[in-house]
Design a protein with these regions (language model features):
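Short, surface-exposed ligand- or partner-binding patches at beta-edge/loop junctions that are enriched
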Residues: 88
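Rhodanese-like catalytic fold shared by cysteine-dependent sulfurtransferases
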Residues: 1-35, 40-84, 93-144
């Protein structure tokens, strides 16, 4: 009897339909602006590892709810289905599954940073503490 699909199998299948960005390419796009960057990791993970500067935290478990225009808890920043969205997480797996879900929901321009935050760091870019200090004070950017 075959067991269900593994996490890796699901990520691989989702990745066939998802655009992957090398960290250098993602950095260029982010520097230009006009991009929504979302870290889909859990808040405790972001506190532990940090996140890419400018990232919003919307967890994998909340993303589809926040992106659904018919949900009460929808996020106004996710209403434009044509906007450029870049997703990340610790290693890229959860972000890939999340990107696949957003594409199924009708978002047209969704991509994932290859290797997630680890790939970002390996490319020589820094992560910022979460929550990011604002004027020397910690302020949560979580969208809960």
């Amino acid at each position: 009897m075959r067991k269900g699909k593994s996490f890796r199998e699901r990520v691989h299948e989702a990745g066939v339909h998802v655009a992957m960005l090398a960290p250098d390419d993602a950095k260029k796009l982010l520097d230009r602006g006009g991009v929504t960057l979302i870290d889909v990791g859990e808040e405790w993970q972001l506190r532990e590892r940090g996140t890419i500067p400018g990232a919003r935290n919307i967890t994998r478990g909340e993303l589809e709810i926040r992106a659904d225009t018919e949900q009460e808890r929808r996020d106004p920043a996710l209403q434009d289905r044509r906007q450029k969205i870049i997703l990340t997480c610790g290693g890229g797996g959860k972000a890939t599954l999340s990107a696949s879900a957003l594409l199924e929901m009708g978002f047209a321009d969704v991509s994932v940073i290859q290797g997630g935050c680890r790939g970002w760091q390996q490319a020589g870019y820094a992560l910022e503490p979460y929550p990011a200090p604002i004027n020397g004070n910690a302020s949560s950017r979580s969208n809960k």
